[in-house]
Amino acid sequence: MKRTYQPNRRKRAKTHGFRKRMSSVGGRRIIAARRRRGRKRLAV
């Protein structure tokens, strides 16, 4: 059986990347929350 996680850098960035997050209101909220927490990495 094929495993569910098949790493792919491009797919990862396109799905969870910074620009993708900024493209929606919900995503902007996530970035803001991570900024508030002081996360080193905001998105992938």
Swiss-Prot record:
Gene3D superfamilies: 1.10.287.3980. GO terms for biological process: translation. The keyword Ribonucleoprotein applies. One of its GO terms (cellular component) is ribosome. The keyword Ribosomal protein applies. It comes from the Bacteria. GO terms for molecular function: structural constituent of ribosome. Residues 1-22 have a biased composition (Basic residues). Residues 1-24 are annotated as: Disordered. Keywords: Ribonucleoprotein, Ribosomal protein. It holds the Pfam family Ribosomal_L34. PANTHER family: LARGE RIBOSOMAL SUBUNIT PROTEIN BL34M (PTHR14503:SF4), MITOCHONDRIAL RIBOSOMAL PROTEIN 34 FAMILY MEMBER (PTHR14503). Belongs to the bacterial ribosomal protein bL34 family. This is Large ribosomal subunit protein bL34.
